[in-house]
Structure formats: C-alpha cells, structure tokens
Amino acid sequence: MNRCRVAVDTPAHSGLGNTLDYESEQPLAAGTLVRVPLGRRDVPGIVWPDAEAAKTPLAEDPEALEAFALKPVAEVLGSLPPLPPAWCRLVEFAARYYQRSVGEVALSVLPPELRKLDDAGLAKRMRLQDKRAAKAGPVAAEPPPEPPPLTAEQTTVLAALESAAPACHLLHGVTGSGKTEVYLRLAEAALTSGKQALVLVPEINLTPQLEARFAARFPGRRLVSLHSALTPAQRLANWLAAHRGQAELVLGTRLAIFCPLPR
C-alpha cells in the first residue's frame, strides 16, 4: 500500500490542514483526480505533489498499518490526465495569497460538473466528445488573412517581449491603438511553436467579439471559450478540450486563468 496526500475542499479554519493522507494500492501521480471518504461521504479530491509521501510505502506490518489508520482512496478518475505541476503551483500561490486551504482553491476552480462525476461518467463524456470531434472532421484549413503591417510601437513591444524573460508587461493605449494586434501576434508565435495560447478577456460581453476575431485570424485552429455564461456541460467540454491539449486557443474571463494547459 502507498500513502498519498489529497487536497479536498475543506476550509482553512477547519484544522484539517492543506491535505489529508490516504492509502492507495498503486502509487498515484500528483494531479490525479480521486474520490475519497471524508466523514460519512465520498468527496472529490486531487492527489497533491509531495515527494516524500509518494516515496513512502505503508509498512506491511499489520500493527503499523493499524497505527496509521488511513482510509483508502475510494475511486481514481484515471480517465483524465493528471493536472500539471504548474497548475498545482498556481493553486498554491492563490491559496497563500487569499489565505485559503489548497483544496478549497483547487476544487473551487474546477468545472462544477467535473466535481460531480465518477470515472465511468467522465470516461463517457470524453468518448462522446471524441466522437463528435471525429464526426465533425478536421476544421477546414483556409489560408489565414494577411495581417496588417505593424506600427513602430507594436514592433518595439513585440521585440521587447521576445527578448525578455517571462514577466508581466502592461500595454497602455486608447481603443483602436493596436493592442489586440500585439496579442494576436503573441498567440501566433505560441501556436507556431506547438504551444497552446490562453487569452484573458476583461469582461464577458467582449468574449464573442474577440472570439470572432481570433477565429478569423487563425482558421483551422480549434478555439474554445471559458466564462460563467456557459452551461455546466459546455464549460466542462471546453475545459476538457483545453486540458487534453485538443483546444489550441482558449479565450476566457478571469476564471480561465486556472484552466490547465499541457502545452
């Protein structure tokens, strides 16, 4: 048996700590979604990165096992790829900043529909999603439109972003000054290098407009959106497409910052 540490949705003031220990028959990768017993019910949880816990098998001695008194993981949602380490680090930062438990933040930023599903239900959703994608066929790869020539300011900004280490940069300008074109060029660079691109929208009403502009600029690229106006099923489908690497472009409001992107 192996010990794993699981983040569950418990308040920071509950006294339970950031993670709870459970036992599993097989080692579980960090970021794996599970269901674990908590009190009288099974709740969703996430196996949390902990190098020492992952390396420590429970003693085979029955007396030692009894001393640990760990409950077993109820179910492993093995159909879903584990959440990436970068996502876990982002959640840990948010938990520290807002003084919340890791599980409280981690579970709250997952799609509500995902938290309700067991592994069989999740696998079924993913099969249906794959069938719909196969039935629709590949997106017609039309030639992308010719981008407008860059202004001197845009050229300077892009050159600075390409040469600098990853950091926060502020683009300031009135409407129509060319900020969106900079975002489009940065997204193009990410897509060309085989990465996914996440574009955050300041308010939900701007999502359709920006989505149409990105779709026109990148024909043949799969684009999904994430915001609170989507139905629970739509939000889960788009989240899965992003997490599984199927969606290349993700547009969304601030909730999309917690969307895991493998590339």
Question: Predicted regions: what is each one?
Answer:
Residues 1-263:
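Accessory, non-ATPase domains that flank or precede helicase/AAA+ motor cores in DNA-metabolism machines
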